[in-house]
């Protein structure tokens, strides 16, 4: 029985040595998902912060709901809104 144990240990030793010595082949379909995930999270974080800064800067306004700011030049003289503005400024 002792010889069977020795043979078993010898075979296991040979298998581990053969596995350790085999050169690692480069598999083109092995991807590094951890660096891909970290890169995606960094880009998502940058875009999120950029979006918050754009919203807080108030530079991006909707054109259909934008009120005329004071001090801006009037619209064209032929429009109805500009004629009302001219009349309202004369009364002041």
From Swiss-Prot:
Residues 57-92 are cytoplasmic. The modification Phosphothreonine is found at residues 79, 89. The modification Phosphoserine is found at residues 82-83, 88. Changing residue 62 to S: Significantly reduced half-life. The keyword Transferase does not apply. Associates with and regulates the activity of the sodium/potassium-transporting ATPase (NKA) which transports Na(+) out of the cell and K(+) into the cell. Inhibits NKA activity in its unphosphorylated state and stimulates activity when phosphorylated. Reduces glutathionylation of the NKA beta-1 subunit ATP1B1, thus reversing glutathionylation-mediated inhibition of ATP1B1. Contributes to female sexual development by maintaining the excitability of neurons which secrete gonadotropin-releasing hormone. Belongs to the FXYD family. Homotetramer. Monomer. Regulatory subunit of the sodium/potassium-transporting ATPase (NKA) which is composed of a catalytic alpha subunit, an auxiliary non-catalytic beta subunit and an additional regulatory subunit. The monomeric form associates with NKA while the oligomeric form does not. Interacts with the catalytic alpha-1 subunit ATP1A1. Also interacts with the catalytic alpha-2 and alpha-3 subunits ATP1A2 and ATP1A3. Very little interaction with ATP1A1, ATP1A2 or ATP1A3 when phosphorylated at Ser-83. Interacts with the non-catalytic beta-1 subunit ATP1B1. This is Phospholemman. It comes from Homo sapiens. The gene is FXYD1.
